[in-house]
C-alpha cells in the first residue's frame, strides 16, 4: 500500500501586516444629489455615508489590488519572494477569466505563486482570511497575501438612488504567515441561500438589493454569528477591543455593536465606522477599515479584533484576530 506524505505547517497563523488603497476622486452626497432625487441629509440618516471614492474609468480592480497588496508587504517588511500564495477576494472583476490574483501576483513580483480569486461578495475577505490561515497551518503555503478589492462603480446604475449612494471602490490587503501563538481564530461561516434573491444582478448587469430585507437579516442574524465566532476562539464579548464588521450601512453596524454590548461587550469597544468616508466597498471594506483605524491610532498592535463579513448569497463569515 502506498503512503502519501503530508505537508507539515505552522502551529498557528497571524496577520503580519496590512495595507489599503482608495482612488483619488471623492464623491460627496451633494454631488450625487445633483444626479438623482436625494439629499445629503437623506443619505446620512439612512446609511451614514458622507462621502465615498470612485475609481477613474481607466483605473482597474487589479490596479487597486496591486497597490494595497504592495503596501501590506511593506508594512511587515517582506519582499515579494517571501510570499508564495495570493488570494484575491472580489465580486466585480470585469470578466470571469483570467483570474485577477495571477495578474496581481505577477505585477507585484510574486513569481510562480499559487493564485486564485474567491467570490463570497461582501463576506469575501473573511472567507479568504480563513482560507489563508488554513493554508499556512496545513503547510500548503508559507505566507499568503490576502486582498479584497472591488470596483463596484462598474456594476452600479449611476442614477439608482438605492445603490449609487452606497457603493464605492477600493482595496485592502493583509499578509498571513506563521506564528507561535494563534493570531487568527477559527472561522464561523455559512450561508442563507433561501435569501439569494435579496441581492443580485439585473438584466442590465447592475447590482440590485432588497434593502429592507437585507437590513432586517443583518440586524438580527449577524450578532449571533459574531458571538459564535467569539465562542469558537474561547473568548467572551468583554474580550473584544475592536469590532470590524463589513461596512455595509452605519445603521447595521450600530445595531450589531448594540446587540454585542447587550451580551457583555465593553462600552469602550472600538467600532469601525469607515463607511462614513469610504462607502460600501464590499470585500475590501474590512481590511481597509483595519488599515485606516490603525493609521488613525484607533487600534494598536495586540488588540483583539472581531471581524464579521456578510453579504450577497446571502453569505457570512467571522473570526477573531490579533491586530498586527
Question: How would you name each of these model-derived features?
Answer:
Residues 1-57, 159-220, 224-228, 310, ...:
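Condensing-enzyme catalytic core mediating Claisen C-C bond formation in acyl metabolism
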Residues 3, 62, 66-69, 73, ...:
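Claisen-condensing/thiolase-fold acyl-transfer catalytic domains that form or cleave C-C bonds
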Residues 15-17, 43, 72, 83-86, ...:
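Buried hydrophobic positions in well-ordered alpha/beta secondary-structure cores of metabolic enzymes
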Residues 38-39, 61-76, 217-233, 286-293:
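Short, well-ordered amphipathic alpha-helical segments that serve as non-catalytic structural scaffolds
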Residues 16-19, 89, 119, 144-150, ...:
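Short beta-strand segments
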Residues 49-51, 82-87, 106-119, 155-159, ...:
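Glycine/charged-rich beta-loop-alpha catalytic/anionic-binding loops adjacent to active sites
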Residues 135-168:
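Flexible, glycine-rich active-site loops centered on histidine and acidic residues
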Residues 81-89, 237-246:
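Short glycine-rich phosphate-binding loop at a beta-alpha junction
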Amino acid at each position: 500500500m502506498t503512503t502519501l506524505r503530508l505537508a507539515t505547517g505552522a502551529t498557528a497563523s497571524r496577520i503580519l501586516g496590512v495595507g489599503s488603497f482608495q482612488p483619488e476622486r471623492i464623491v460627496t452626497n451633494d454631488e450625487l444629489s445633483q444626479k438623482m432625487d436625494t439629499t445629503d441629509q437623506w443619505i446620512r440618516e439612512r446609511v451614514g455615508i458622507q462621502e465615498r471614492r470612485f475609481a477613474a474609468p481607466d483605473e482597474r480592480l487589479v490596479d487597486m489590488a496591486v497597490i494595497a497588496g504592495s503596501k501590506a508587504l511593506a508594512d511587515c517588511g517582506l519582499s515579494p519572494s517571501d510570499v508564495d500564495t495570493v488570494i484575491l477576494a472580489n465580486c466585480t472583476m470585469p470578466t470571469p477569466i483570467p483570474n485577477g490574483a495571477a495578474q496581481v501576483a505577477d505585477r507585484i513580483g510574486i513569481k510562480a505563486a499559487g493564485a486564485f480569486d474567491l467570490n463570497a461578495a461582501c463576506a469575501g475577505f473573511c472567507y479568504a482570511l480563513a482560507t489563508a490561515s488554513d493554508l499556512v497551518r496545513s503547510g500548503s503555503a508559507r505566507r499568503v497575501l490576502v486582498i479584497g478589492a472591488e470596483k463596484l462603480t462598474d456594476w452600479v446604475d449611476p442614477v439608482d438612488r438605492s445603490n449609487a449612494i452606497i457603493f464605492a471602490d477600493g482595496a485592502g490587503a493583509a499578509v498571513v504567515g506563521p506564528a507561535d501563538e494563534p493570531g487568527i481564530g477559527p472561522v464561523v461561516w455559512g450561508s442563507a441561500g433561501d435569501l439569494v434573491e435579496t441581492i443580485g444582478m439585473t438584466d442590465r448587469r447592475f447590482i440590485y438589493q432588497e434593502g429592507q430585507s437585507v437590513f432586517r437579516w443583518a440586524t438580527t442574524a449577524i450578532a449571533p454569528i459574531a458571538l459564535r465566532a467569539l465562542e469558537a476562539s474561547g473568548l467572551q464579548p468583554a474580550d473584544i477591543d475592536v469590532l470590524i464588521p463589513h461596512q455595509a450601512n452605519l445603521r447595521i453596524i450600530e445595531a450589531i455593536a448594540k446587540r454585542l454590548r447587550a451580551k457583555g461587550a465593553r462600552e469602550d469597544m472600538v467600532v469601525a465606522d469607515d463607511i462614513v468616508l469610504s462607502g460600501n466597498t464590499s470585500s475590501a471594506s474590512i481590511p481597509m477599515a483595519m488599515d485606516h483605524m490603525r493609521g488613525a491610532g484607533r487600534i494598536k498592535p495586540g488588540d483583539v479584533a472581531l471581524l464579521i463579513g456578510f453579504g450577497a448569497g446571502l453569505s457570512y463569515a467571522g473570526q477573531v484576530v490579533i491586530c498586527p
